Amino acid sequence: MPGIAGHRDLFFAGGIPVAQRFIKRHNQSIFFMKKFIQKAFGYDPKTSSIKTEILAGLTTFLTMAYILAVNPGIFSALDGMPGGSVFTATALASILGTLVMALWAKKPFALAPGMGLNAFFVFTVCLGMGYSWQFALTAVLIEGLLFIILTLTNIRKIIVDSIPVSIKKAIGCGIGLFIAFIGLNNAGIVVDNPATLVSIGDITTGKALVAFIGLIFTAFLVVKKVPGSLLIGMISTAVLGMFIKDPATGKHITEFSGVVSMPESVAPIFCQFEWSQILSLDMVIVVFTFMFIDMFDTIGTVVGVSTKAGMVDEKGNIPGLNRILLADAIATVGGACFGTSTTTTYVESASGIAQGGRSGLTAFITALCFAVALFFSPIFLAIPGAATAPVLIIVGVFMMTPIKDIDFSNYSEAIPAFITMVAMPLCYSISDGIMLGIISYVLINLLSCNFKKINPAAYILAALFIAKYIFL
């Protein structure tokens, strides 16, 4: 019988091959895991690392998580759409779209219900035109399905080319002005005035004071390029609201009721479509506007971010662009079913790409973060309009960037672009801004004999829009 020393010698003698087998299996597991990640997400170890991709995904989420509070806040203006359900729908649409982008397109772009598009849904289609939110959801669904068809055909290019470049630039700027105006109004910084239409509110007290302080602080974070500045600014403003009361109600601006809870059901808004007016001209105009904004928003974001990050080929083309656009369209269809406005690719994806994200793994991590956020709805839903207002205003500033590309020395381009921009906030309607812009562009250049500048399809659009104003 061997003694203790003998057993010890046998253990260590046999332990070496055991350890070697363990290390070999461990290395094989890592190898197969990396191979799986490469295949599933298009990950290339030559251009990035797994750690970098994970950090990039977290960064992207932090920069766009504000939508989880802002979107339910915007939809709160509508009856019949519970804030908790809209929050869940927002998160689910973001998860679905971002996962499709990660696993199918294999790109580091994240998706969520789009700013501007949610404002158009609520304030133009429902409150402005007087249609139900079910009508608007139906328009979003149709837009998503059409977007899929257009992406699979050459029609998308025809539509894109039919709109003058100056009008394309002006639309983004106009939407920026529109959502900034909504933010200022929600905050009480800009209020109704029977004599002058609008005037400044009392910014020395209540929600206007909280929003103004939040705006300055958030702007400071943006200037300093602090990662997640919009989310940090929004949460900080909400915390400030816990210590300041609203004179109108006597309650604190912010009142938290919890931290963690199960996600609220989307049943009240799930697949609530209205088919009775799908052939009306208003439906056509609403669908066109949704699709137009979604298409150019997505293309502009993807092209701009990809070019800046060097994610293009030697000819300047973006590999897999059609898959990116299809992922966007599929997300819109899914979002409409869940009960929220058009889901689109977020320009905030640039923050994660700037951190080194280059594959679908970045988007996958962002989707996981949205999944976790589902269980923190009490925090996001407690954030008041005074805290989301600074985000709306600053996002409006971001959307004004294309204005520098409009040639204001050429009045045949500048005047229609200007009309497009100012009509959106002043008419409180994104679609009216687009229609007036295209009509004015065609008529001004037609009278100026600039026939070659006008795309044939633009004549058709202008005629349809004029008919809409005359007969409806």
Map each language-model feature to its residues.
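Membrane-embedded alpha-helical modules
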Residues: 129-243, 364-472
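Helix-loop-helix junctions within the multi-pass membrane cores of secondary transporters/permeases
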Residues: 34-71, 93, 114-123, 127-175, ...
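N-terminal, intrinsically disordered charge-dense segments
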Residues: 3, 15, 20-21
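Intrinsic-disorder-associated, low-complexity terminal segments enriched in Asp/Asn/His/Tyr and depleted
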Residues: 7-9, 26-27
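Juxtamembrane transmembrane-helix boundary signature
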Residues: 93-115
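Aromatic (phenylalanine/tyrosine) cluster motif
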Residues: 11-12, 22, 31-32
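Loop-to-helix transition at the N-terminal end of transmembrane alpha-helices
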Residues: 80-99
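Helix-loop-helix hairpins and the membrane-proximal interhelical loops
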Residues: 33-85, 199-200, 234-322, 465-467
